[in-house]
Amino acid sequence: MIPRLKELYYKEIQPQLKETLGYKNTYMGPKVEKVVINMGLGLDGADAKIMKSTEEDLGKITGQKPTVTKFKKSVANFKTRKGTNAGLKVTLRGNKMYEFLDRLVNIALPRIKDFRGLSPKGFDKFGNYTFGIKEHIIFPEVNFDRIDKIRGLDIVVVISALNKDHSFALLEKLNFPFIKKGDN
């Protein structure tokens, strides 16, 4: 079954962007390549029980088993050792990526308390969009009674676009709730 957001992109959004951005070919337009979700654990990464429960939570949120990231250096001030667990990360592509973005935009983000929108300043010079979420419990897949600690997520949406304006146009068409100019 084709995800709803993927179908919407190919049938409606891609032709609209071709017209508005002035592309000669439909496939020259911006496209979401992948979504990378990172959850840093810090010193909690050394605890196997916490690591396992957090890995399960991130797996439920993304629908894919996360990979463990490790510290690259030992830093005495942060009490970290080289090679110990630093966090978890998941890279989503294809159908799982579209399903995650659909759930993020339509279910998870509206559940954030006092949510006014995403900052449009999160674009880099290549057009990729990065933002953070302070509480992973906004996703309905996470059982609130079973979590030990509320953790944050870093989400990077990698987009193949010529510049950040084209990426912004794509994410707006995908219903990303950006803060409008003039709203504070």
UniProtKB/Swiss-Prot annotation:
Gene3D superfamilies: 3.30.1440.10. It holds the Pfam family Ribosomal_L5. Keywords: Ribonucleoprotein, Ribosomal protein, RNA-binding, rRNA-binding, tRNA-binding. GO terms for molecular function: rRNA binding; structural constituent of ribosome; tRNA binding. Transmembrane segments: none annotated. This is one of the proteins that bind and probably mediate the attachment of the 5S RNA into the large ribosomal subunit, where it forms part of the central protuberance. In the 70S ribosome it contacts protein S13 of the 30S subunit (bridge B1b), connecting the 2 subunits; this bridge is implicated in subunit movement. Contacts the P site tRNA; the 5S rRNA and some of its associated proteins might help stabilize positioning of ribosome-bound tRNAs. Part of the 50S ribosomal subunit; part of the 5S rRNA/L5/L18/L25 subcomplex. Contacts the 5S rRNA and the P site tRNA. Forms a bridge to the 30S subunit in the 70S ribosome. This is Large ribosomal subunit protein uL5. It comes from Pelagibacter ubique (strain HTCC1062). The gene is rplE.
